[in-house]
């Protein structure tokens, strides 16, 4: 099979898989990935590890935030979209503030709030309450 045919087949099978998925489930999954990336960056700062994993997850978190912010539907849901934009902007600022000042709690604030909103229960709650 030629490379172009393989790419087309892959893209078609990838798109076919998304047709039956609820858009809210996709939105939740993206936010779950954001929580995980924020958590990893926070842990790496705590361990004082500056490595590819930390950098990759920092970039991943920023990319997810940017993607979420640019795909909000202001025409359909103005207030909700505005509120979500502000919330993701808060997350973005805390991420950048945390990575530049090496303060993991700044990043953890975003992750904990996302975790609570979507009820992921990904982040362990031991000692987290003093973060918020």
What are these regions (language model features)?
Residues 1-40, 44-63, 70-72, 79-93, ...:
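N-terminal intrinsically disordered, cationic/polar leader segments
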């Amino acid at each position: 099979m030629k490379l172009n045919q393989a790419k087309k087949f892959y893209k078609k099978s990838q798109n076919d898989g998304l047709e039956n998925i609820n858009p809210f489930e996709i939105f939740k999954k993206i936010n779950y990935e954001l929580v995980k990336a924020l958590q990893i960056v926070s842990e790496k700062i705590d361990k004082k590890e500056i490595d590819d994993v930390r950098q990759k997850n920092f970039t991943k978190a920023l990319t997810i935030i940017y993607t979420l912010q640019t795909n909000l539907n202001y025409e359909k849901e103005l207030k909700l979209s505005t509120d979500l934009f502000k919330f993701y902007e808060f997350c973005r600022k805390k991420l950048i503030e945390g990575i530049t000042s090496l303060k993991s709690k700044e990043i953890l604030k975003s992750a904990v709030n996302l975790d609570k909103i979507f009820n992921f229960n990904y982040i362990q709650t031991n000692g987290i309450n003093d973060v918020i």
